[in-house]
């Protein structure tokens, strides 16, 4: 019963859409109706600028960290793993916003930073290298999320499966980006969208 409460609580924490709130407060827009239509940091960056994107990334990361930490601290390891998955599901498919959310990268990073700081930093570092080299945020994110389960494997099979679920969700949410990467139509970082 307690694990179910943890899952539900984490899911609704995930529903707290930083990009939606930032869009409303700074420009009175629904970020999902601008740019790529995604409720995430990259779309906020292209639509509203660096400061708004930084706030979005920070907020989405913190909710991932908070969900995993609280479940781990007050319930246990297994509950924390479930909370980590639930908060990302809540971010990606928020019932409070008609199931139209983000892609879960910042929230997954937040979860991973508490679950395994070393695995998180290693994955982020690889993502940053890819971003610097190719200038595609999507490719950077996909690469970091693909490698994350393997960095988590040293903590045991349970952590590997946990990482694999997070990875699959992230890649699934990037399926349109993957199509554009293949056709050469994906936007590189720095290209701004007008509101």
Swiss-Prot record:
Entry's EC annotation: 2.3.1.275
UniProt keywords, alphabetically: Cell membrane, Lipid biosynthesis, Lipid metabolism, Membrane, Phospholipid biosynthesis, Phospholipid metabolism, Transferase, Transmembrane, Transmembrane helix
SMART domains assigned to the protein according to its UniProt record, in alphabetical order: G3P_acyltransf
Pathway(s) it belongs to: Lipid metabolism; phospholipid metabolism
GO cellular component: plasma membrane
Reactions catalysed, as given in the entry: an acyl phosphate + sn-glycerol 3-phosphate = a 1-acyl-sn-glycero-3-phosphate + phosphate
GO molecular function, one term: acyl-phosphate glycerol-3-phosphate acyltransferase activity
Principal location class: membrane
A Pfam family per the record: G3P_acyltransf
TM regions (residue ranges): 2-22, 79-99, 111-131, 146-166
Protein's GO biological process: phospholipid biosynthetic process
Membrane topology (UniProt): Multi-pass membrane protein
Family matches, as NCBIfam families: glycerol-3-phosphate 1-O-acyltransferase PlsY
Subunit structure: Probably interacts with PlsX.
Entry similarity comment: Belongs to the PlsY family.
Name under which the protein is recorded: Glycerol-3-phosphate acyltransferase
Naturally occurring in which organism (per UniProt): Alkaliphilus metalliredigens (strain QYMF)
Gene: plsY
